[in-house]
């Protein structure tokens, strides 16, 4: 199963979300699931974090996921087309990010009010 974990966000609880998402990522069996870590910066930009972030938190119970920008930006494209849902932009190319389940580990504004969930539902 392809699982996307969303964390961070434009909220005063940004850091709390990073700690919570680290715990979630630590407890999903990466041998059975493909886990994509998607950080949302305090400015609202979405980035796909490298696999090394997942490995870091799974090896160290005190490690916290990063929210640093990467070369892979994530966008949400509404609709039901080939390039809809969560998509990765890298080197000027856009491709769908295979996703079966999104785990929104977002606290505070835009997370607990259902806004992000609504956006994802529109994107199918």
Regions found by a protein language model. Give the residues of each.
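ATP-binding N-terminal substructure of ATP-dependent carboxylate-amine bond-forming enzymes
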Residues: 1-124
């Amino acid at each position: 199963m392809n699982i996307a974990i969303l964390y961070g966000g434009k909220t005063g609880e940004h850091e709390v979300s990073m700690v919570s998402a680290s715990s979630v990522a630590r407890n999903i069996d990466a041998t059975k699931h493909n886990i994509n870590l998607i950080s949302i910066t305090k400015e609202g930009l979405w980035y796909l974090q490298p696999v090394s972030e997942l490995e870091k938190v799974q090896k160290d119970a005190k490690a916290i996921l990063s929210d640093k920008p990467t070369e892979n930006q994530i966008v949400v494209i509404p609709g039901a087309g080939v390039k809809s849902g969560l998509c990765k932009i890298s080197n000027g190319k856009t491709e769908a990010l295979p996703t079966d389940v999104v785990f929104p580990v977002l606290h505070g504004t835009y997370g607990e009010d259902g806004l992000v969930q609504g956006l994802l539902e529109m994107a199918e």
